[in-house]
Swiss-Prot record:
A GO MF label: ATP binding
PROSITE patterns the UniProt entry points to: DNA_MISMATCH_REPAIR_1
The UniProt record lists the keyword DNA repair: yes
Region of interest (Disordered), ranges: 363-397
Gene Ontology CC entries for this record: mismatch repair complex
HAMAP family named among the record's database cross-references: DNA_mis_repair
Function statement: This protein is involved in the repair of mismatches in DNA. It is required for dam-dependent methyl-directed DNA mismatch repair. May act as a 'molecular matchmaker', a protein that promotes the formation of a stable complex between two or more DNA-binding proteins in an ATP-dependent manner without itself being part of a final effector complex.
The gene coding this protein: mutL
Organism: Shigella boydii serotype 4 (strain Sb227)
CDD domains (UniProt xref): HATPase_MutL-MLH-PMS-like, MutL_Trans_MutL
Name under which the protein is recorded: DNA mismatch repair protein MutL
BP GO annotations: mismatch repair
InterPro entries: DNA_mismatch_repair_CS, DNA_mismatch_repair_MutL, DNA_mismatch_S5_2-like, HATPase_C_sf, MutL/Mlh/PMS, MutL/Mlh/Pms-like, MutL_C, MutL_C_dimsub
Compositionally biased intervals (Low complexity): 364-391
Similarity comment text for this entry: Belongs to the DNA mismatch repair MutL/HexB family.
Amino acid sequence: MPIQVLPPQLANQIAAGEVVERPASVVKELVENSLDAGATRIDIDIERGGAKLIRIRDNGCGIKKDELALALARHATSKIASLDDLEAIISLGFRGEALASISSVSRLTLTSRTAEQQEAWQAYAEGRDMDVTVKPAAHPVGTTLEVLDLFYNTPARRKFLRTEKTEFSHIDEIIRRIALARFDVTINLSHNGKIVRQYRAVPEGGQKERRLGAICGTAFLEQALAIEWQHGDLTLRGWVADPNHTTPALAEIQYCYVNGRMMRDRLINHAIRQACEDKLGADQQPAFVLYLEIDPHQVDVNVHPAKHEVRFHQSRLVHDFIYQGVLSVLQQQLETPLPLDDEPQPAPRSIPENRVAAGRNHFAEPAAREPVAPRYTPAPASGSRPAAPWPNAQPGYQKQQGEVYRQLLQTPAPMQKLKAPEPQEPALAANSQSFGRVLTIVHSDCALLERDGNISLLALPVAERWLRQVQLTPGEAPVCAQPLLIPLRLKVSGEEKSALEKAQSALAELGIDFQSDAQHVTIRAVPLPLRQQNLQILIPELIGYLAKQSVFEPGNIAQWIARNLMSEHAQWSMAQAITLLADVERLCPQLVKTPPGGLLQSVDLHPAIKALKDE
């Protein structure tokens, strides 16, 4: 067979294979055209699940008479004219393929009138060459599209249609999604002459929750947590259901929109799932209705035939932004206040990944982990489920070890000055600048040391805490601040805001930079030791601590932070121990000369040697 140009009708039918999957696809394309035309009311009439009739009527701007023929031609559009337009799409449609593709597999008529015209005109395409006929018609300002006998000329496609009920359910779902995207538009849906859905427009500043409840149900509305999150050109709004009360029925509600366009994007879903994972079971899914607004130049919508997917130019930034936005609203729902100074502190543990600072986008579900105890375990309220473990947590210390270390990690009185540790062990030689040689690691968190023939055990977490305290305590110059990739925004009370403002200069010396407004505080930078911490937990604790203080000394605040930082290591290796001791010997020489209690313990081998000799 020789190479030849395909007839227009056949070419359009091939294109329809990508655009027109089922009646719901037709409804989606036509309703989006109505929205692009500025319609505030859209009426949708369906017969026999869309196989017999799809009629879309709107009150948009309409189409001029001399443009009707072009409207039914392939690659004819009013929405873009250059590559620059394509790279900054703000309309829902832009390819100019929908009407031509639909008309090639159905009997389509387009009737329209603009406000400037005195009469309406009707256009339809027919024949092998898809010639367009235009004739006068009666119609108000706006456009009506009728699609009759879908797939009448492609029997192979028609036989793949499901039952009337199934096809209409897909149409109903599409309308639900569109109604959630445009609260300002009235949408009416009827099937076989019976009105099925009536979504009335919500005025500016009106109660969007009414339409949300009508579409997603009262169960979702009762558990919905409102989100309002912004950073630069990124804005996240919407609702996420409380993960503690998620049900299988609620989990079906997963609606996401990017610049008003409904999406099924893996990156967005992964960010939301990761934010909720500590409260969800392995077989549970989050429920959400979220709207992401982003600079059109930073997103490519021309990557999927049906425009269901997008590609972000800065996917890592978008992922972390959504993750933090969802996580922040979940953190604000904690019903029990976090324990501060009066509760026993657990032993340090390994750090969960901080999405605020880390900036890495692992586009895969985290590996399965064994359940571990949560960082805080307040008594659950009656009828509520126990608190879920924090992700990435590792087993902590034994109870006896934790009690010993807890006693060492007590916050000093507010007026107490930062002092060098009191010697609890015999002082080393005056010229000593080393703890000795690391022989091995004992019980995963103690280093067995040898120096001048003497053996001792060193508690690595305690050494790590003292090192951090020195790193956090400002010297002649303030501690260097490390800007966060995405600032952390938290809601604070009036008392907490007042305490933060009083402590602002002290916090600035520690490298903590923040900005406050009426009811929120935005953390913009933290010192290096805090970069890999979970700031969603640490910063609210710090604010609570400051609210109870009357004097704000950088040294006391640094000591409190050092006490509350989580350990970087669940199990220490020889290399990690050697590196830590080298840093301690360099930055904390007083610990070498006068070890504090709980840091170093001499090991007397004489009883063991004597016992061996007696044998």
